[in-house]
Amino acid sequence: LTTGGIRGGKKQMGEYYPRSFNMGITKKVFQKTGGYRIPFMGEDLEFSIRIITAGFKTVLIPNAFVYHKRRTNLMQFYRQINYFGRARINLTRFHPGHLKILHLFPLIFIVGFISVLVLSLLNQNLGFLGLKCYVIYLSLITAEALLKLRSLKAALYTPLTTLIQMSGYAVGFIH
């Protein structure tokens, strides 16, 4: 119910673009593409775009295990997501056709949320209706997390982490 599906999971919402933390390539792919070209945010996704453009196929191996460091606090998570938002803009400069409407969802979410808060000050009824929509959305995310994770503690964190995810990406995107 958030934007996680666009990053690449078992259920693809489009072409699979591997990230460097779980990417394996052949020598032929490296030689034809030249490997990483740019030392900036989103370099792995930029490389994946060039791999696919060069005619190579990318696949997700669902049974492969990848261990990587998770962010250990919410501020680190915010910084990482903010970085992803800024990376999306950098990628769009190199590959304009790869900005999708779904990439705008966090920005729309946060602009809408701020608008609802302002609207609440101007018209309580309309503001309440808007806030109700956000509460329903966050409740659905919490319920989905509870069903998937089977952990009440983790599920109760999802509204907060969703707001951090959306705001971090949106701020990075417009930065």
Region spans (language model):
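Generic alpha-helical secondary structure signal
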Residues: 20, 25, 76, 80-83, ...
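Catalytic donor/gating beta->alpha subdomain of glycosyltransferases that bind UDP-sugars
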Residues: 31, 37-99
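Membrane-interface anchor segments at the N-terminal boundary of transmembrane helices
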Residues: 97-108
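Short loop segments at secondary-structure junctions
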Residues: 27-28, 55, 115
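Membrane-embedded multi-pass helical conduit in multi-pass membrane proteins
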Residues: 109-175
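Short, flexible, basic/aromatic active-site loop/helix in glycosyltransferases
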Residues: 1-17, 21, 31, 94
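Short glycine- and hydrophobic/aromatic-rich loop-to-beta-strand nucleating segment
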Residues: 15-28, 45, 109
